Amino acid sequence: AFNYYRIPPQVLGLYPAISLGNMDRRCCGLGSHAVVKDLLHAPLHRLVFTRAQSGSRSLFKSHLLTQEPPPGSFRQTEHGFDVTSPEFTLLNLAAKVSRNQLLMACYEMCGSFAVFKPCERTQQQLDEAISLKFIPPNCGWERVNDTKGNDTNLWKRTPLLTATDITAFAKQAAGLRGVKQLHWAAEHMTGQAASPFEVQTSMLISLPRDEGGQGIEIANNARIPLSEAA
């Protein structure tokens, strides 16, 4: 799901939906679908309610859900499958990555940027759609260019969440694995970031010394009112 939330909408729109009804019970044919091959990549992480739902081990990495998550933890997509909400995605990550990695993921979800590197086929389709004007100017996320005008893997978009949203969800999800780590990450965010570099700098300056930072209190992109003299 974290990979899904990194995909620009203009890229998703180039791909057909997945028809799960035409596949066998283990969904073995899913691995050859363009959405999986080009965008999501196997193994796909999925939540199951019983061990019998594990499916193909080469295609899926299944995680057993032992407790009902908060309402709104799943979202329908236009491509024939559901994904965990941004908040629930972060909670699932919390039990599997380090605290600093989780904090970086929270910054990206709450930031005005995403990191997405198109594969060769995706880039070709995107270039063709733009040249044929199938994708209008200023449609979807804005791709950032380097100093030479070349495309980068950084995209500008509106934030998916706020730290307040994460904290509220963590309270609702009390008892689920990863809640403590998610609370920690939300408490150590210093505001909205616009790039991975801003995230790294924020963490280096603001995290406690025993966490590898300088322990300095900061607020990202805080508005500073100027006097008439200024």
Model-identified regions with their sequence ranges:
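Surface segments flanking catalytic/ligand-binding clefts of nucleic-acid enzymes
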Residues: 134-135, 139, 145, 149-230
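Short gly/ser-rich loop at a beta-strand->alpha-helix junction or flexible surface loop bordering the NTP-binding
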Residues: 1-178
